[in-house]
Amino acid sequence: MGNILVSLISDQAIPNLEMIKEKPVDAYLFILTEQMKEKLGWLKEAAGLKDSSIIQELIVDAFSFEDIDKKLSAIVSDDHHYLVNLTCGTKIMSLAVSDFFKDIDCELFYIPGKNDSYVRIFPGIKKPYISFKTKITLEEYVLAYGFTIRHKSKLLTSPEQTEKVFNYFLNHFNHEKDGEALKILRKKREDRKSFPHFGDDFEVPGFLTRLQFIPENPDHLTKNEIKYLTGEWFEDYVYSLVKNKYQLSDEEIGVGWQLQKGENNTPNEFDVLYIKDKKLNIIECKTSVMLSGTSFKKNIITETIYKVDSLRNNLGLFAKTNIFTLSDLNESDASIRSSIDRAKEYKITICGKADFQDENFPENIFKK
């Protein structure tokens, strides 16, 4: 007798992925409609199910009890034990599948979405909540929604070094001296051919000294070091801040990811992504203290709104989104007020310089 996990396929990917990880079995039965074939492909990719010999797909009419019962009767055997996940699919699919399997050797499960647990609803009078022993990783999450991971960044230096850089930019940044050094570094960042020695760029060594940043080579910077100094340090800082706050594993959080859904869609870049309470969270990190002018503040917000709207409406991915910036966000400034108001409509949380300087930091930014 073998164990077979039965899953109902719908737009929700995570409940099925959770049960696949939680219940190692001998074979899999997926019940779906014709329209859900692509989503099943994403689920199998995320779960690492590549052996077609242990996978059976049953195409049904999602709104027909008779069709579902007839097709299940043709393939289900009394020789197996069935574990049935009723969380997804249409209501009729769930009811029809539940009615069918109750007359067979089976267990029926449902994932309510609250807490990190699922319910065994059959057999037995009691309906115990059972804690998941496994967790969904960030990579599994995005794969389950059809995304390809094009790039992942890594922390350039230690969290302690990045903490020093953060404190300098937040409290001691000199727009005249440091701003000039950053202009030079940005030009070098755009030069993809080479990154020459400092030469006459005497502003840069002084800037590095004030930051307490020690490069690999004393007289020039690597490409990655220049990227770090011109803004990516803030992504690294927020990554470590969030990871420590929620005690996340390396598999639950990422920095500098580039995701693409389908070859015809433009890749999206994300500064910090993480999974918390089985939900995807995105933080866009912008060190706009380096630049002057309210148009930059506005562009950060509108760019993020566009990205969130595209993810939701075109790519089917919903995430809690935040913008972290070291700019002074003055809502009385007419040039950015409309963008901030629009961000609120999209439930995008914005944390500015004042939030990072607040006496209750960092707890205050996680309560917004």
Residue ranges and their predicted role:
Residues S10-D11, L32-M36, I59, P112-N115, ...:
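Short, acidic/turn-prone active-site loops that include or flank metal/cofactor-
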Residues M1-W42:
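N-terminal beta-strand-loop-alpha-helix module at the start
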Residues S94-V165, F169:
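Mixed-charge intrinsically disordered linker/loop segments at interdomain junctions
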Residues M19-K21, K39-K50, D333-Y346:
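Short, aromatic/basic amphipathic alpha-helical patches
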Residues N3-I4, S7-D11, A27, L32-Q35, H81-L83, L86-C88, Q258, K279-N281, ...:
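Structural motif
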Residues I136-K368:
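Intrinsically disordered, low-complexity Ser/Thr/Pro/Gly-rich regulatory segments
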Residues A27-T87, K91-C106:
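A broadly used, surface-exposed interaction patch
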